[in-house]
Amino acid sequence: MIQRRRFLARGAGFGLAATLSPAAIRHAVAAMPLVVGQSAALTGPQAGFGTAMRDGVQAALHSVNRHGGVNGRPVQLLSLDDQGDKAKTAANVSLLVANPRVAALTGFTTRPCSEAGAVMAAEEGIALVGAFSGTPLLYGDKAATTFTTRASYERELEAIVQHYRLLGLSRFGFVHLEDARSTNVPLLEKILARNGGQLTITAPVDRKGSGLNAAALRTLETNPPEVLIILANNAPLTGFLREYAPRTLVMPKMVISFVDREKLLADLGHDAAGVGFSVVVPEYTREKYWVVREFVALARELGTPVTPVSLEGFITGLALAEGLKNARSESRTAIIEGMGKVGSLDLGYTNMRFSRNERTGSRFVDLSLASRNAGLV
């Protein structure tokens, strides 16, 4: 098991040309950063996710570089903006993999973009470490070179369903992104079937804005569920909850982690009361965990906003760095193998595990609830 002190101190070496003198090797290594590529939504309606993931990964690499980098070599993040658009992600990945200096990929965002990136990464034989999505494809064979650093949506949905089934509730509703219906509705139906619940109503919303909100609200009024699960981003969700949450204070409403929670709470204010959230990293107030403590300190130093998404990016960056340190060389194949050699990384709140046969690093899920002052309990 790799713990904090050992993690920060490690610096596995890459093989270098034997024809170079030690001094020349040191100079060459110091002069050339190891580059990892990112495609994420850095502008547009989903920019909150992309910038937070980028900033979290950057904070992790800052820490790694401060402690000697990888064999004395700094690690550099090259981020490209895809605006949350699948076609732009594909174009960005093509640019990144065409650059021989890009050794691995990291920090992708949204389901369509993460899926596109994962499939292309597998085809190109390059590691993709961490994506801000729990969509099933990332955990399957089509994403054979993707190493996930968050629990899947299946794990999050199951945690919510099991919690409310224990409380005796069985009738569930689902607000989902319209373009993800074919993936996420059957997934929830499967989870409910094995836990003795029923999906009684579904309502789609638009990933890019509030255009479908009125129809979703009307649909839910026809057959109110006992529990409402929501898997949507901020663009539709803020307006939806501003109208729906005050009407349904008693009804549990649980939002899956694919959301900029802090912005949502700030935008909703008192209207957030009673809205619950599933999270795939610990609350950033829990500084008893070394990884949280270290991130919060670095974030203050770097001026990085502290959110669950930026903390997830930080954890992703640490996992990536550990894979780089385990690689026998800087080749893309060696880095994939290096990720498979990470073993158990002790983050305090959970052990992230990667092996040759295990690419799902974390299964951690927790639940929280917004109070009347938009805080969390």
State where each predicted segment sits.
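Extracytoplasmic "Venus flytrap"
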Residues: 37-56, 80-86, 109, 179-182, ...
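N-terminal export signals
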Residues: 6-28
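Periplasmic-binding protein-like
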Residues: 101-109, 129-131, 173-176, 224-234, ...
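Segments of small-molecule ligand-sensing domains
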Residues: 300-310, 318-376
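C-terminal segment of N-terminal export signals and the immediately downstream linker at the start
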Residues: 1, 23-41, 48-50
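Extracellular/periplasmic periplasmic-binding protein-like sensory domains
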Residues: 243-313
